[in-house]
A protein has these predicted regions:
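ABC family nucleotide-binding domain
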Residues: 1-140
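C-terminal boundary and immediately downstream tail of ABC-type ATPase nucleotide-binding domains
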Residues: 128-131, 137, 141-160
Length: 160
């Protein structure tokens, strides 16, 4: 799971943050975990940050490290909770590009987001919730072009 406020351990380097779960579960040796951390950092375009600490990174870089950390345990499903909401607008795209690449590779992603253009672009199914309840569910085409509830119609008129 990836959260909006990164949840990186400040006393660990970028690599150590990524290696922690695979090492604690005896999933990988230290050497294999280091190799995997480097591969994952390359995947999110941050290999040069391997030995840096979270406070040396931008918000977008921290979020990409959080993505790499989540991928370190080889999940079948990636859960993303408002992963761009704490970022400056110029950093949002770098995180969304990583998520888009994962979706294209076939990763199942469940994402809570207000990034409607992004949701429309990469989603197979969109769920619109209002006041804690599901109001509409369907293809991006259906929900964005033919919203049936007043709540979704109102929401889309404000954000699109």
């Amino acid at each position: 799971m990836i959260f909006q406020n990164f949840n990186l351990f400040p006393h660990l380097t970028v690599a150590e943050n990524i290696m922690l779960a695979p090492r604690l579960t005896n999933y990988l040796t230290k050497e294999k975990a280091q190799e995997q951390a480097l591969r994952l950092l390359q995947r999110v375009s941050l290999a040069d940050k391997f030995d840096e600490y979270p406070d040396q990174l931008s918000g977008g870089q921290k979020q990409r490290v959080a993505i790499a950390r989540a991928l370190a345990i080889n999940p079948e499903i990636l859960l993303c909770d408002e992963i761009t909401s704490a970022l400056d607008p110029q950093l949002v795209n770098e995180v969304l590009l990583v998520i888009e690449a994962l979706a294209k590779e076939g990763m199942t992603i469940i994402m809570v987001t207000h990034e409607m253009a992004f949701a429309r672009k990469i989603s197979d199914k969109v769920v619109f919730m209002y006041s804690g309840k599901v109001h509409e569910m369907g293809s991006p085409e259906m929900l964005f072009n033919h919203p049936s509830t007043p709540e979704l119609q109102r929401f889309l008129s404000m954000v699109l």
